[in-house]
Amino acid sequence: MTTSTLTQSSDLISDTPRTSKIPMSQKVAFGIGMLANQMFPAALGIFMVILVESLGMSPLMWGLIFFLPKLVDALTDPLMGYISDRTESRWGKRRPFVFIGAVVAGLSYIAMWQLYEDNGITYNFWYFLGWSIVFFLGMTIFSVPYVAMGYEMSDDYHERTRLMAVAQWIGQWAWVIAPWGWVVLYDPEWFASATEGARTVSIYVGLICMLLAMVPAIFCDSEDTSSAEPKSGGKTLAQTFVELFKGIGITLKNKPFQRICTATFFIFNAYNCVAGFAFFIIVYYMNNGDPVAAGNWPALFG
């Protein structure tokens, strides 16, 4: 990496106030955002069972609904980071995107689950896939600047570590709370069908997570970058994209980064494989295909 590249990278991360000590109130505000960042995918994974169990979608459709939005997400994440790094506004370069992404993700999550059996499998597939892509675009707009915001809140390595520890502790509660959605959705005393439950519960999940995701945008400090020198340097859009992909190429050549990516790939795939099958194993192997008879077991294993 050249000296000029290092200088540009340093300039990009110097727009926000960097102090050694982060107040606990700021850590908690940032951590509440992490709860939303983890609750959205946690709740989505719980609700996704309904597509197969209640709406009759094939495993192929289910797989495509998982795969295609995440493919879009993988392509847009680095682009979002590039845009955020070069944003000048009175609210800083992260907070506007965190706020907008929270709104898009919350509202699209609600829309995504307004499914009806009468519409047919094909219609529900395309309807859900479309809104799912919008949802993951909203999550990209929210999560990429949000995570970057955390690394810019202090210039002290240990303080950033403490910030992330607080945030992760708060965020992990999403995976404790979300599995109970299975119990609520399939309890006949709550809803006549799981699909009806999803339509109703998604409204609460979407609105609550949207409000939680807004907290860092409102309460975490940032610096006015509206008068900052533009980072594009007068480059055209095409030149900007070329620079973006050159930067990605340089990053991918970094051996430690490759190891981290490889480990992350296997860890997340292992976890998601087990998590994806847990509900079906408990319902079909232990309870003869009756989700009502499964009771609290899916939540306890989740």
Predicted segments with their positions:
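Membrane-embedded alpha-helical bundles of multi-pass transporters/translocases
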Residues: 2-302
